[in-house]
């Protein structure tokens, strides 16, 4: 055999070997990927209540140690009521957009939600009778911007360990953010342009740390992201308080990037899911830049537009479903996609 032929054969063997090694590596990656899929034995369909259906969608173990659940709720209605801050006072508040329970008004109470049957704009219908509301958002010319396909998250969050999260108590209500004149920080009220590149450390790419607490100047064709985060540490006693805030607290922060290394303060020792409202708006020639938009609650012209971002929440979940969300998705560290309940079922879709 000539030296040239021998070299060609060696080269061919090396190529084959590299192909085999690449195939094995790819197979290993696939095997590891599939190993992250949660093995589920779904319940019998006859056992499912209305609003809950079987689903063969895969659920994966979260890659960052958090446990997550998400759900969609459509806009329901608009009014100037606020049953938490102005109970039984029709029209006493600034304009709000409501989601979930379709009859939320100044007279809505926890009993109202718990006795409701089929009035909800959320996935699962009557299984999620929670009342969600936020101030209306307007362009510079006064056109209201619709909250399209918003996502409502129930997560362990990055600060607390997933396995210590408790089911929120029935009857719990709370407010995130401030509608008053004092400026707020980005713990609760978060805005950012989707085109921004976060320059600071973060827990993961889904939690950039370049948010601002006011409406930013996003260019045309960009996307404005808005996120309102509720406190997740409960005092363990009171379902409400005089200001709808004092019975709740934000956790003591984890050390970046170590997820779950924070804790609840001693005054508010009970950890519940981190609830957040998540919205996105396209920036167009018609809407103009978000820096020119304003909230219905923006009353102080000395502060940047959007500084009054806040949200209200009243727990109207079916207790069994909320327990499934916490036990199946959050405590386990699973990443349950929109509507998935972590047991081979999901909430009935609305889109």
Describe the function of each predicted region:
Residues 1-3, 29-33:
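Short, aromatic- and cysteine-enriched interfacial helices/patches
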């Amino acid at each position: 055999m000539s030296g040239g032929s021998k070299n060609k054969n060696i080269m061919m063997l090396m190529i084959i070997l590299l192909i085999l090694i690449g195939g094995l590596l790819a197979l290993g990656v696939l095997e590891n990927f599939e190993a992250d899929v949660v093995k589920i034995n779904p319940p019998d369909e006859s056992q499912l209540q209305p609003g809950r259906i079987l689903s063969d969608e895969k659920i994966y173990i979260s890659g960052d140690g958090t446990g997550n659940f998400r759900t969609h709720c459509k806009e329901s209605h608009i009014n100037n009521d606020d049953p938490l801050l102005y109970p039984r006072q029709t029209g006493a508040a600034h304009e709000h957009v409501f989601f979930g329970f379709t009859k939320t008004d100044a007279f809505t109470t926890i009993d109202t939600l718990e006795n409701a049957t089929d009035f909800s704009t959320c996935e699962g219908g009557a299984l999620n009778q929670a009342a969600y509301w936020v101030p209306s958002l307007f362009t510079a010319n006064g056109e209201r911007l619709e909250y399209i396909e918003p996502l409502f998250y129930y997560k362990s969050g990055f600060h607390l360990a997933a396995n210590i999260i408790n089911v929120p108590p029935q009857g719990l209500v709370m407010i995130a953010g401030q509608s008053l004149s004092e400026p707020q920080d980005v713990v609760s009220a978060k805005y950012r342009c989707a085109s921004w590149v976060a320059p600071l450390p973060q827990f993961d790419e889904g939690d950039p740390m370049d948010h601002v607490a006011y409406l930013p100047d996003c260019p045309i064709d960009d996307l404005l992201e808005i996120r309102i985060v509720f406190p997740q540490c409960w005092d363990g006693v009171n379902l409400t308080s005089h200001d709808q805030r004092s019975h709740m607290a934000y956790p003591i922060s984890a050390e970046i990037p170590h997820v779950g290394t924070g804790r609840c303060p001693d005054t508010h020792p009970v950890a519940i899911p981190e609830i957040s409202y998540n919205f996105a708006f396209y920036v167009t020639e018609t809407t103009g830049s978000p820096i020119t938009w304003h909230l219905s609650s923006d009353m102080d012209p000395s502060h940047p537009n959007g500084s009054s971002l806040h949200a209200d929440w009243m727990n109207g979940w079916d207790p069994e479903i909320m327990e499934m969300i916490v036990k199946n998705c959050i405590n386990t560290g699973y990443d349950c996609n929109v509507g998935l309940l972590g047991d081979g079922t999901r909430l009935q879709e609305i889109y």
